[in-house]
């Protein structure tokens, strides 16, 4: 009996110590998101991914979705099936301190069917749907060896607020006094309550497995409407704030501005900045040790037109999303290497090949942007607000100063995977890692 008790106590100590190692409270955790929506070759993806993992504490694989009929987890990696799940979790054999989580939603589980898009709310509404989801989560974690899951739940978005300056800004404020606020979700109070129920039930099911659960707060999701902060904090291990894309060319195609400033910018919505979001969660009694700051590895671009002027100083009038890059293939979105190559382009080149002019922020408050004014034919103008290694390091320093748990990079596929920018591979990720190293 005495030997059994000694064994039990030792076993319990090992479990507790292991968990302390995982959740060490310091601003040094790096969460690396990996979005595979453009991946077609599993082996190539793994080869490109592996060098980044020495800098990551957590790898968050995205994204899985939800079947709108069964409410079970489904793969969104069309053509890859579930093979890549096993390949991703097998990376832990080389990186034994790495924890690999499966992210659900992340604004990737989208269709043109409105009923299908509402499935994230419908799932919350009854116990049987929630149980189907939870059982499928348990099965996926056990089958493929994930260490847990990330809940990047797809709640309805706040409607865009168009940015204006000068007299138009004050006119808009006056008009807003007489406008009715749009109804985002008539049952938001019920969904808020049931989301807590889902997290409670998930936590109970994951605890015996020793699984981790994080929550990603996606851009433009109202925490006031959908997230009951205090009970949520009790059920998740980390809360990851996607503190970027405050303004995008799809939410407002007519005005280009900073998309992920640390602090409030003049002529900008005062809530559209990192410090505002962090303070909101802290004001609602969230422990700093649970908060993680999201940093993008890309830029958002707008088309400059003749009315945009030639200075590039934001806010500027724009003509819609900028041209798609050769990697992202998405209008209004450029990866870090697509931007850095244009900044260092030969100045003699013209047209779409012409270089971007970079404008840094010496205050470290708002971020960096680059632009190319229209040519004599009013063509090829572009303006992009983006993240680079220096600004990412600034945000890591901010996270440390606020005593947050760490930084999450969105995402590895947008970083300099092949070293095109001249600073080696994964230069944004390494800048975050090096910023934290200074404080050890």
Curated annotation (Swiss-Prot):
<dbReference type="Pfam" id="PF00704">
    <property type="entry name" value="Glyco_hydro_18"/>
</dbReference>
<dbReference type="InterPro" id="IPR029070">
    <property type="entry name" value="Chitinase_insertion_sf"/>
</dbReference>
<dbReference type="GO" id="GO:0006032">
    <property type="term" value="P:chitin catabolic process"/>
</dbReference>
<dbReference type="InterPro" id="IPR050314">
    <property type="entry name" value="Glycosyl_Hydrlase_18"/>
</dbReference>
<dbReference type="InterPro" id="IPR011583">
    <property type="entry name" value="Chitinase_II/V-like_cat"/>
</dbReference>
<dbReference type="GO" id="GO:0004568">
    <property type="term" value="F:chitinase activity"/>
</dbReference>
<feature type="domain" description="GH18">
    <location>
        <begin position="28"/>
        <end position="439"/>
    </location>
</feature>
<dbReference type="GO" id="GO:0008061">
    <property type="term" value="F:chitin binding"/>
</dbReference>
<feature type="disulfide bond">
    <location>
        <begin position="32"/>
        <end position="56"/>
    </location>
</feature>
<feature type="disulfide bond">
    <location>
        <begin position="340"/>
        <end position="421"/>
    </location>
</feature>
<keyword id="KW-0732">Signal</keyword>
<dbReference type="InterPro" id="IPR015520">
    <property type="entry name" value="IDGF"/>
</dbReference>
<comment type="similarity">
    <text>Belongs to the glycosyl hydrolase 18 family. IDGF subfamily.</text>
</comment>
<feature type="signal peptide">
    <location>
        <begin position="1"/>
        <end position="27"/>
    </location>
</feature>
<dbReference type="GO" id="GO:0005975">
    <property type="term" value="P:carbohydrate metabolic process"/>
</dbReference>
<feature type="glycosylation site" description="N-linked (GlcNAc...) asparagine">
    <location>
        <position position="283"/>
    </location>
</feature>
<dbReference type="GO" id="GO:0005576">
    <property type="term" value="C:extracellular region"/>
</dbReference>
<feature type="glycosylation site" description="N-linked (GlcNAc...) asparagine">
    <location>
        <position position="403"/>
    </location>
</feature>
<dbReference type="InterPro" id="IPR017853">
    <property type="entry name" value="Glycoside_hydrolase_SF"/>
</dbReference>
<comment type="function">
    <text>Cooperates with insulin-like peptides to stimulate the proliferation, polarization and motility of imaginal disk cells. May act by stabilizing the binding of insulin-like peptides to its receptor through a simultaneous interaction with both molecules to form a multiprotein signaling complex.</text>
</comment>
<dbReference type="InterPro" id="IPR001223">
    <property type="entry name" value="Glyco_hydro18_cat"/>
</dbReference>
<keyword id="KW-0964">Secreted</keyword>
<keyword id="KW-0217">Developmental protein</keyword>
<keyword id="KW-1015">Disulfide bond</keyword>
<keyword id="KW-0325">Glycoprotein</keyword>
<feature type="glycosylation site" description="N-linked (GlcNAc...) asparagine">
    <location>
        <position position="126"/>
    </location>
</feature>
<protein>
    <recommendedName>
        <fullName>Chitinase-like protein Idgf5</fullName>
    </recommendedName>
</protein>
